[in-house]
């Protein structure tokens, strides 16, 4: 490695076990060259996978696709040689192998672009490719914050619940990036349980690349991001309820049980936060209503909200 404007170069070497060694070196140009030596394969570990061209591309796409600097690699391709002119009657196409320097990473992540620069179709395609869904999301939430917590977030409310959503196998969490580098594929600490259906990505400049899961749980920045996202998701769902009632009622059919569970759990600690998102079937109105809509139509002498509980609407009705 040689700094710009310096006459000295240094070689840093480590076996990856304990410590490192630095010695003077010879280098004509400024910059850093990194050489990695792969361990020999063992019966259980196949390190040569890291030397496979497609394996390297996959690793870069997974962990460093959104690093803002280009990650380039020489790749070999085949192409047809130019046809001779004039072309003989017995001419057969010939092919040649050539090497091309390719940039492997996207560099500019979609969540760092202004919402006005991205179409609904581009958001939908990114969501379906990233999270393996076959339908467009019901809601796209873009959040950017600078100040006490610096982060970019791109969140999606799915149109339907995953097949395992109400099972113990379902894992909540958002993909967590630190300055464009993937740190954790599913960070559960970014979402409260009652919003566990939300999928998406959070990219923060305030997190260390080598932060552990245990350190994340104690990280104050993560708690600030959690609180900000919780408020943002709640506001977006409330906006959907107010401005697109039909879509919200479709959302409620898929995830309403989770919202109700959130209002009920922890001794009702979150009931105040979630009450405006709740929907109930009104026998009188013959449609879904919010608590506020019910209260607005109560007779002046009525003091309480009346309800009937049961396994189904029909079983809850009292026939006179």
Residue ranges and their predicted role:
Residues 1-318:
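Conserved GHKL (Bergerat-fold) ATPase module
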């Amino acid at each position: 490695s040689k700094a710009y404007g310096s006459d000295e170069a240094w070689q840093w070497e480590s076996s990856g076990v304990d410590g490192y060694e630095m010695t003077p070196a010879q280098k004509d140009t400024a910059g850093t060259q990194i050489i990695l030596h792969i361990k020999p394969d063992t019966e259980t570990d196949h390190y040569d996978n890291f030397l496979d061209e497609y394996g390297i591309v996959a690793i870069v796409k997974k962990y460093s696709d959104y690093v803002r600097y280009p990650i380039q690699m020489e790749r070999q391709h085949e192409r047809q040689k130019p046809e001779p002119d004039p072309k003989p009657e017995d001419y057969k196409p010939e092919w040649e192998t050539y090497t091309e320097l390719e940039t492997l990473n996207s560099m500019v992540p979609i969540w760092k672009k202004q919402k006005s620069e991205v179409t609904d179709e581009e958001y939908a395609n990114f969501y379906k490719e990233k999270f393996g869904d076959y339908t467009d999301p019901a809601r796209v939430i873009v959040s950017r914050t600078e100040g006490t917590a610096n982060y970019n977030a791109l969140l999606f409310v799915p149109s339907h619940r995953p097949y395992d959503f109400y099972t113990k196998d379902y894992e909540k969490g958002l993909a967590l990036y630190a300055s464009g580098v993937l740190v954790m594929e599913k960070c559960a600490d970014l979402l409260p349980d009652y919003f566990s259906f939300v999928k998406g990505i959070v990219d923060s400049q305030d997190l260390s690349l080598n932060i552990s899961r245990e350190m994340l749980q104690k990280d104050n920045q993560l708690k600030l991001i959690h609180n900000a996202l919780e408020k943002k998701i709640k506001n977006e769902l409330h906006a959907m309820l107010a401005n697109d009632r039909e879509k919200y009622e479709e959302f409620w059919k898929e995830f309403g049980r989770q919202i109700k569970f959130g209002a009920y759990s922890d001794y009702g600690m979150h009931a105040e936060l979630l009450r405006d998102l709740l929907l109930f079937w009104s026998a009188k109105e013959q449609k879904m209503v919010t608590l506020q809509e019910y209260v607005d139509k109560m007779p002046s002498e009525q003091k309480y909200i009346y309800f009937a509980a049961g396994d189904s609407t029909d079983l809850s009705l009292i026939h006179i």
